[in-house]
Amino acid sequence: MKYDHLLVRYGELTLKGSNRKKFVNQLRNNVNKSLKGLDGFVVKGKRDRMYIELEDHADINEITYRLSKIFGIKSISPVLKVEKTLEAMSAAAIKFAQQFEENSTFKIDVKRADKNFPMDTYELQRELGGAVLKHFDNISVNVKRPDHEIRVEVRLDAIYMYEEVVAGAGGLPVGTGGKTLLMLSGGIDSPVAGMEVMRRGVTIEAIHFHSPPFTSDQAKEKVIELTRILAERVGPIKLHIVPFTELQKQVNKVVHPRYTMTSTRRMMMRVADKLVHQIGALAIVNGENLGQVASQTLHSMYAINNVTSTPVLRPLLTYDKEEIIIKSKEIGTFETSIQPFEDCCTIFTPKNPVTEPNFDKVVQYESVFDFEEMINRAVENIETLEITSDYKTIKEQQTNQLINDFL
């Protein structure tokens, strides 16, 4: 079947009332960004639907795939745009039925948005079904459990007919909910947390704490790859890589072993807080899960949060670990997350970290060294990368450079 349009249905935009125009415009911008590099199409965003007009050479499968990853889209259907005549609709219905298997069943489903159309829903179903049955003697009607369903939408401008409905990502268009800073560790949880807030229309930049030589270049490349996977959904994402070795070594030198994890997280939060203000973000996002590890008890969260007045969002707070793993697999980050390269959250882990840290004690331990100066140095030396969906890792860039130098 050669389709001439893609019909894009909005997600929760239908709930946005007077703000809908803003949301539709943002979604159209996101669609154009996602389809960059492809040709043979024109995007037409309307109040209640978006239509992608297709030229003969358009790659409909690739366009549909990319659209299915965009937040704010509920579903996509390849459609035929048909004149508002019974003859044109009947011809299109027969065209659909030509693809049906022998002895299969079908039904006609009609939605009549144009209430001024001269035929009602029942009449259209009867006439179109009759046209198909007259043309084929090896298929039959089954209105309850059909093998195929020819869907007909009668709209003001035209008739749209289709069979397939491809699920979209749902949620709200990224760019409608403000900006946050995602603390991206390299584990399973934080990429899922990032995806969850993006699904609510939030733009993210990511921060990663890198402690060479204790953490390797492979650990850094792993985080770049996780960011790249997230960028497939929303376009370029800035990744801020913090040189954290000095701070982490000093914490492990002067803080009581049971409190090093708490203090390390507090230092991370202080750095993140400074960066939040620099980039104009409204909140910090992390992948913490209540009770999962010692630093994620309520007592620990209280002690760690105390160093910032910036809201900290924890989308995975009440998830089971298995739920997080399932989501990680769904979004395509799981296999990268489980690569065995240690990050700064796993090195120097004490044997018996405190689960109910005493706030006064941790403040006392930190008072013996000038961490503010170290934090400022770390922020000043942040490496910022703009990660796109086709971003090459450091190793790939070096290999390509060597090849070019050789040639």
Curated annotation (Swiss-Prot):
Localization (cell): Cytoplasm
Any one Gene Ontology molecular-function term assigned to this protein's record: tRNA-uracil-4 sulfurtransferase activity
Any single Gene Ontology cellular-component annotation: cytosol
Enzyme Commission identifier(s): 2.8.1.4
Pathway entry: Cofactor biosynthesis; thiamine diphosphate biosynthesis
Boundaries of every THUMP domain copy: 61-165
Superkingdom field: Bacteria
Keyword ATP-binding in annotation: yes
Transit peptide as UniProt keyword: no
Signal sequence residues: none
SUPFAM superfamilies linked: Adenine nucleotide alpha hydrolases-like, THUMP domain-like
Xref: SMART domains: THUMP (SM00981)
Catalytic activity: [ThiI sulfur-carrier protein]-S-sulfanyl-L-cysteine + a uridine in tRNA + 2 reduced [2Fe-2S]-[ferredoxin] + ATP + H(+) = [ThiI sulfur-carrier protein]-L-cysteine + a 4-thiouridine in tRNA + 2 oxidized [2Fe-2S]-[ferredoxin] + AMP + diphosphate; [ThiS sulfur-carrier protein]-C-terminal Gly-Gly-AMP + S-sulfanyl-L-cysteinyl-[cysteine desulfurase] + AH2 = [ThiS sulfur-carrier protein]-C-terminal-Gly-aminoethanethioate + L-cysteinyl-[cysteine desulfurase] + A + AMP + 2 H(+)
Biological process terms in GO annotation: thiamine biosynthetic process; thiamine diphosphate biosynthetic process; thiazole biosynthetic process; tRNA 4-thiouridine biosynthesis
Annotated binding of ATP, by residue: M183, L184, H208, F209, R265, G287, Q296
Pfam families in the cross-refs: ThiI, ThiI_fer, THUMP
Keywords: ATP-binding, Cytoplasm, Nucleotide-binding, RNA-binding, Thiamine biosynthesis, Transferase, tRNA-binding
Role of this protein: Catalyzes the ATP-dependent transfer of a sulfur to tRNA to produce 4-thiouridine in position 8 of tRNAs, which functions as a near-UV photosensor. Also catalyzes the transfer of sulfur to the sulfur carrier protein ThiS, forming ThiS-thiocarboxylate. This is a step in the synthesis of thiazole, in the thiamine biosynthesis pathway. The sulfur is donated as persulfide by IscS.
Entries under PANTHER family matching the protein: TRNA SULFURTRANSFERASE
Assigned protein family: Belongs to the ThiI family.
Name this protein carries in UniProt: Probable tRNA sulfurtransferase
Taxon lineage: Bacteria, Bacillati, Bacillota, Bacilli, Bacillales
